[in-house]
From Swiss-Prot:
High-level lineage: Bacteria, Pseudomonadati, Pseudomonadota, Betaproteobacteria, Neisseriales
HAMAP family assigned: Pep_deformylase (MF_00163)
CDD domains: Pep_deformylase (cd00487)
Protein role: Removes the formyl group from the N-terminal Met of newly synthesized proteins. Requires at least a dipeptide for an efficient rate of reaction. N-terminal L-methionine is a prerequisite for activity but the enzyme has broad specificity at other positions.
Protein name: Peptide deformylase
Keyword annotations of the record: Hydrolase, Iron, Metal-binding, Protein biosynthesis
Native source species: Neisseria meningitidis serogroup B (strain ATCC BAA-335 / MC58)
Length: 167
């Protein structure tokens, strides 16, 4: 396994729409293992392949503290949404930035697992939010782009200031 580099917003590659995985093979399974290692090392709960500059429809997540429920979604599609909720989100591609995003309260998602087997998952709460957040990445959308123009401007200014201080 290897740690992967996580792209940082506003890197344009984060806006690339991911292509479907054609075949779940050893290359995809290695990508999944590397994504889990990267996500855990970065203390995240979800990671989309787009964030590591691989533009295929692969997502990993684990909402547990003890890493006991790793989930893999290959070619995920949300087939149903219901309700509305807000949640303060963060993102490994936008470190240190958190803001409230409105999303569906419940979702039903269809995907393939790491063996290439199709499954359906009905999710609510944090899992539903995480699914929607990560699937946004596959569509080239970063969570801050779900915020008002004013908030987006403030975040970009904050990130530019931070970047100047690290150079």
């Amino acid at each position: 396994m290897a740690l992967l580099n996580i792209l940082q917003y506003p890197d344009e590659r984060l806006h690339t729409v991911a292509k479907p995985v054609e075949q779940v093979d050893e290359r995809i399974r290695k990508l999944i293992a590397d994504m889990f290692e990267t996500m855990y090392e970065s203390r995240g709960i979800g990671l989309a392949a787009t964030q590591v500059d691989v533009h295929e429809r692969v997502v990993v997540m684990d909402l547990t503290e003890d890493r006991s429920e790793p989930r893999v979604f290959i070619n995920p599609v949300i087939v149903e949404k219901d309700g509305e909720t807000t949640y303060e989100e963060g993102c490994l591609s936008v470190p240190g930035i958190y803001d409230t995003v409105t999303r569906a309260e419940r979702v039903k998602v269809e995907a393939l697992n790491e063996k290439g087997e199709k499954f359906t998952l009905e999710a609510d709460g944090l899992l539903a939010i995480c699914v929607q957040h990560e699937l946004d990445h596959l569509m080239g959308i970063v969570f801050v782009e779900r915020l008002s123009q004013l908030k987006q401007g403030r975040i970009k200014t904050k990130l530019k200031k931070r970047q100047k201080h690290t150079i």
